[in-house]
């Protein structure tokens, strides 16, 4: 898990016109992903013409059964994988135009990551884990310290900074991971099953924290199997067989009403029903 973290830091809107929506911070246009076996004898299409956009300040959950393509989609948005065809834009910048040597810097400067298993480095203190993206970006200590204080205060982990990951709870680890994600002031936070390793109480606290961060203007995309987690989002995008199956917008719905809408859609999806995106 630590190696995965270091790799990332080191190394109903359907839209096809990248310049047509000035509010969109992220645009995914006709993205396909085909995996080929080692000797090229078999091909698996993980994504098929996926198109959607995310506006600045949106909180979008992505759901789908295992193997539906949602993790592949997240990896492409994270610039960890490349589409076979199609384009992804972040604030108008096309991913395919970014040179390989610049990808790690692009991730550090524009994306924040929150993982299911926290991906904290055990031999680093909580403070050092949070500051690591800034260290890798070459920031001066006084600037790092200036950014750290308001972030840890907001997340309620100021007293944990000198501790190590093995000395704190799962919920506290995930708060530290969120702090690490937002300390760079990213344009987009990508969360992969962020409540998956947490108990019910810690999950509720994390979801409340995500809502608070989103209310401050942070754009979030969260992949999740949890109906409860997804019901906190402003929009839920469902992936089935590598395609956008359906989207639900919160509107004036409460979390309870969103929960029911999501559950109903998942029931249709599980039965193999058809639904327009």
Task: Describe each region flagged by the PLM.
Residues 189-192:
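Catalytic Walker B motif of ABC-type/P-loop ATPase nucleotide-binding domains
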Residues 183-187:
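A short, proline-enriched helix->beta-strand linker immediately N-terminal to the Walker B motif
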Residues 164-168, 172-174:
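Conserved ABC ATPase signature
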Residues 124-132:
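Short coil-to-helix segment of the ABC ATPase nucleotide-binding domain corresponding to the Q-loop/switch region
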